[in-house]
Amino acid sequence: MNASPHSKPSAALAPSPTAAFFPSTSRVYTSKAATVVDDDEALDEIRRYESFSTVDWVVDNTRERNRLARERQAASAHFVSSSSNAHLGNADAAWGHIGFGRGGVPPRWWSRGPWGRRAWLVWGIVKSASSAFTDSGVIVLVGILIGLNMGVISLATEWASDLKQGYCSSGWWLNQKFCCWEMMDQAGPGGAPLPAAAKALATATVTVTASIGAAAAATDSAPILPATPAATPTAAIRAVAQEAYNLTIRAIPDHQLWSRSAQDVIQDGFGTGLRLLSRAEGAASGAGDLSETCTDWVRWSKWSFPAWIIYMLFAGLLSFICAHLVKSFAPYAAGSGISEIKCILAGFVINGYLGFWTLAIKSLTLPLAIASGLSVGKEGPAVHVACCIGNVVASFFRSFNRSQAKMRELLTASSAAGVAVAFGSPIGGVLFSLEEMAYNFPASTMWRSFLCALAATVTLSFMNPFRTGKLVLFQVSYDRDWHYFEIMFYILIGIFGGLYGAFVIKYNLQVQSFRRSYLVKHGVSEVVVLATLTAFVGYANKFLRIDMTESLEILFRECEGGGDYDNLCQSWAQWRMVNSLLLATVLRTALVIVSYGCKVPAGIFVPSMAIGATFGRMVGILVKALYNAFPHWSLFSACQPDVPCITPGTYAFLGAAAALAGVTRITVAVVVIMFELTGALTYILPTMIVVGITKGVADWFSRGGIAEQMIKFSGYPFLDKDDHNFGIPVADVMRVCPQVLFASGMKLSELEGKLADGSYKGFPLVLAKHDATLLGYVGKVELRYAIGKARRARALDGDTLCLFSVGPNALDRADGVESSAHGAQQQQPDLLSVASLPTTAAADRAVREDMLSRFSGATGAGSASGLGSTSATGVASQRRHESESLIGQLDVEDDRSSAPSYRSRVDAGDNMSSSSDDDAVVGNAGGGVDGESDLDKLELGGWIDPTPLIVQPGMPLETVMDMFKNLGPRVILVVEYGRLSGLVTVKDVLKRIAMQEKAEAAARTAAAAGLPMSGSANSFTGEGAGAGGGELEALLKEAYEWAQEKWALISPRIERISARRASASRGGAPGSQAGQARYSHLRESTEDRYDDSDAVAEDMPMHSTRQTSATKNTRSEHHQFVLGAQDDDDE
């Protein structure tokens, strides 16, 4: 239902919104209806939702349904008006009856004849059809842009990562892989070596080329004849030599084939052969290191120590540039973004978080953050970037701008596309958005997520950024089956994944708490220190030195036919590999804990997968070593002798799945993502076993993944999907003294004073100060809009009486006046006001008819929807006394996020402006307001929502929590016997959840320590929730304080040294050596004397502080005097 914004209780009638669409039936209200639409358009320009407020989904859905209903009415108006023949008499006047709505009149140059009208009708149909396909077109466009963006980010990341180790001499823009493309196969670095025949071919190329050169030495310009290779003795060598000859001929351009010197032939032939030899023997010499076989790739230094220093310098430089850009231009670009996007999809508004600058800076700095070597990933930030693209693109389309529900669907689809291109898993991306991101996931959202993920994946596939046909670098395929005896080892990997997730989440939150307390002003320095420390620690370990995606590709690979890397598949080096992998697991876990959450784009998905992969590969190597040592054990009876029994790469693959599931607590999406990475149906069951065990172990320690825990840590108003058992009524958590407005009348100055309070987004409306009967709810922005319009229409002062008329007898009850004449005068306008409500659904019609029946009664006391009447006088008297005591104690206690008014539910735009900008916005808004003709009164009743969501005080809190989850309101009013008792918001429920969790944690701690349970009774008060620190936070705090103390001791010496150097540089001119020597001697003696006095002052009692300060001031004055004397000597 829609309360008309222009219902006047005096003589004027409120226009019906249908008058704008049915002029033939409501011509009396045509001008008023145009004013209604003007108000709607003006309010569309106002940003409806304030930053860090919550979207009311009940409001938004109602407004969207009514908007669609008005469009259908406008489209059907043509068929209503075209039944008459009026347009035949006056063609120009008939344009108003065509029924395309406002703005439907064609331009002046359009033909006014019959064919012109038909063409205009066809054009309207085309526009309607195109608008129907606009949504899908926007989804596809967003998906294409996401794919392009991720392709560019992948290439930039690879190039910047390789820049720390060297550069390509043939092109500075090429990374190591593209620079040495000829030296490796399609598998990339560490790929499979060439077969033995190719090695023989390369050797023959070198030999035959040498023979050709010797034969051609006699004649410097001798032609190269095809008969030369035929001189080889045997058929096998002849075939090899023939192929070598063909390679040599192809290496020589056609125009130089008959005029080449012997030296040129020898160089070309030897070059081709040596390249083939290098490629054939690449695996034996550590194919992962292309610098030994690729001459185009130049390392910064051939020595380990200088290369290590340069590696750290590049890491610090890249991290500094990244952190500085984020801090200077887009602070919202820091972090992963998953937690905030979950809250945004649930209705929490963060203005600028999905803006253009965030998109540009995060896309630019994400490759820098990954290339710096920080233990962070790009998959989480890829979701944030994808949502930024969706938001920026949708801002150009009005259909998305004015509907928060459609914008939510688009952002959900964008997040699915972001995961799809990050992991090369379109179906996994859709399931990720369903399982992790979406707060509400209807069927239409599923289709749009699928379409967007498909468009993004196809675009990335066309780009082919790695030139291998892979969407991501660590895609791999397995063709071997697993054995049932391996399930015990899979269980071990699953347990590790659960322990890893619980461990990382617990200690990362402690690091975040320490970072918030001590490192807020040192974000850039922290990032540089972390990057340098990571490079310092990880350079010696090859699994930490290389990029994490490349590390995953190497660890996932099979040994047989998959290539080797640093002897990873060699049996003689298995124990060295075990040690290296274990060290990499431990060190990267520690680095992830301290790095995730720093002020750069930072994800945790791929770092967790890299940790799980190193642990899993280690387990696989140990199992394979056990099989090689005891192949005849009954445990290995299922193994076939001629087929490799154990594949360590599959263990790495399962370890990555376990770690990812442990830190995110996602199950189905992880299984599908890992399946799409391998394409192996045989490993779905092991993956499900591992992920299921990981989920159980991790949830035993704590519930919720890293994203949910970060939401709680940040204090965002987000209700998770878990069920809670409170066992209390809603009255125990409601706000009992909310700010209210009085329908009996308020002075304009008093009303504006309440509007100036930034703690509220709206106010409940009660009958009067002495009667707390609830009449409705009104939003702050609507009131400011109406007052601003009224000020432009006529003069208003602070004593103007503001009225909120809802029913025909409401004001009479409030004033104690029962005037039948006045009531009769008001009755007709109120009936028409109610009749003008749009009827877009059967429920709306039923409520409207109920209101009509209530208002039409001659003796009935009017009541707003949702209010009950008190029949017993005793109960009424008691409730009136309670309401007087309630309303008399109104005050402002804390921030309260309330819903916008009913007017905004139906007609307004999608965003609220900030409270600081509201006055300026209202000043420029258009539209009208009720009661403009009365100089003493200002009627604002048309802006009231007469049907807010209400509950009884005794309703269980669990039911109210389900209402918040399923309906999505911002505020629910608590009403008893028709009178306002309080209100409850999402924050109230979250406070209760936090108190309950804290109490349960305190109880577990007390039980583990053997303390009595009464010691944790105060936990239920909720005080200090989340304020406690952990052991890691305490350790970091002690280290920080120790560093501050040491710096306080060192910094004065550094300052003195700097001052001496500065004075030496000033006194270095000829003729000033004497004065400089005298100054230095005097200053050193003075500093020694005052240093001794400072040492004595440190041992003085507290009452000597003033004396110490005077001593220091004297010292400072003496330094100034000495410097001044030196300046005089210099002059």
Swiss-Prot record:
It is a multi-pass membrane protein. It is found in: Membrane. Residues 815-835, 858-928, 1061-1131 are annotated as: Disordered. One of its GO terms (biological process) is intracellular iron ion homeostasis. SUPFAM superfamilies: CBS-domain pair (SSF54631), Clc chloride channel (SSF81340). Keywords: Chloride, Chloride channel, Ion channel, Ion transport, Membrane, Transmembrane, Transmembrane helix, Transport. It comes from the Eukaryota. Residues 944-1000 form the CBS domain. One of its GO terms (cellular component) is plasma membrane. Voltage-gated chloride channel. Belongs to the chloride channel (TC 2.A.49) family. This is Probable chloride channel protein UM03490-D. It comes from Mycosarcoma maydis.
